[in-house]
Amino acid sequence: MSSIPAPAATIVMEACGSAHYWGREFQQLGHQVVLLPPQRVRPYVRGNKTDRTDATGMLEAYRNAEIRPVPVKSVAQQTLAALHRLRSGWLAQRTAQLNSVRGLLREFGIVIPVGAPHVVPRVRALLEDADSGIPDALRNTLADVCTDLRTLEGRITQVERQLEALAQQLPTVARLRSIPGVGLLTATALVAVVGDARRFPSGRHFASYVGLTPREYSSGATRRLGRISKRGDAYLRMLLIHGARTTLWHAKHRKEPDSLRSWAVRVEKLRGHNKAAVALANKVARIVWAVWTRENTFTAIAHAA
């Protein structure tokens, strides 16, 4: 790093593994760092893959004003992202083991009810019953699996506690959690992925960044809007849509009248549940931008409107 020119330089890199760390290091030395999305750089790399062609491709991509750089993430953002990634991995492991146990026991005529809370207590009760029909050779192994499942559940709970503790230090998270359908996971994921919503000129641009706006197919006087683009971070989009589904369910079953929920229920009656959930997620993304940029809560903004 000492070989980087002393006068402030512009350093262009692909936003790949460890790029954010090096970006922070270079910024501390007074340099301007530009991280480019690898998928946007690839079309500019011609011929064989060498350091020279990679560098040439990155420079050509950097000169294209239509390619938006990736902001350098802070340590706090990467910490939140790492906790979310660990939680997602443990959730996937738990789901795989739960399904495996239910499938194995079904082969012996034992049906475990659907739902994570039912599996471990039910399996342990069966293991204590000598006449349950579980082969003796499987009993110790299934007991170990139950222990593993409890361990995974403990890790998931611990990560969520860590996220809650970090959220207490971030005023932005508290404001975002005032929005319907945005809880701890979604709010902290937004901070981890986006960093600062003020880099987007409008809520519509922010919703497009998350991939919740429709694709456009235009030719001449013909203009058709298709399915959502699904650009951007798939995990963040999933959280927003799941939160919208929960909000929609509450609006229908718990009668929580307000303009946002009433609008979502009307859309569901016209277009169906899935489209209504995605439409609500799109609207929530725009509200997220408004709450974030105005540094106010959803309730205060709604009353001001």
Which positions does each model-derived feature cover?
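Conserved phosphate/pyrophosphate-binding and hydrolysis machinery centered on Walker-type P-loop NTPases
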Residues: 73-76, 109, 113-117, 139-146, ...
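Glycine-rich, often acidic, oxyanion-interacting loops/wings at catalytic, nucleic-acid
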Residues: 84-175, 255, 297
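Phosphate- and other anionic-substrate recognition elements at nucleic-acid/protein interfaces
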Residues: 1-131, 214, 248
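Phosphate-backbone recognition surface of nucleic-acid-processing proteins
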Residues: 44, 175-184, 189-273
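Low-complexity, acidic/Ser/Thr- and charged residue-rich accessory regions of DNA metabolism proteins
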Residues: 221, 252, 259-305
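Short alpha-helical scaffolding segments that buttress acidic/His motifs in well-ordered protein cores
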Residues: 61-62, 80, 142, 190, ...
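Short helix-capping/linker segments at secondary-structure and domain boundaries
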Residues: 65-68, 97-98, 156-159, 195-199, ...
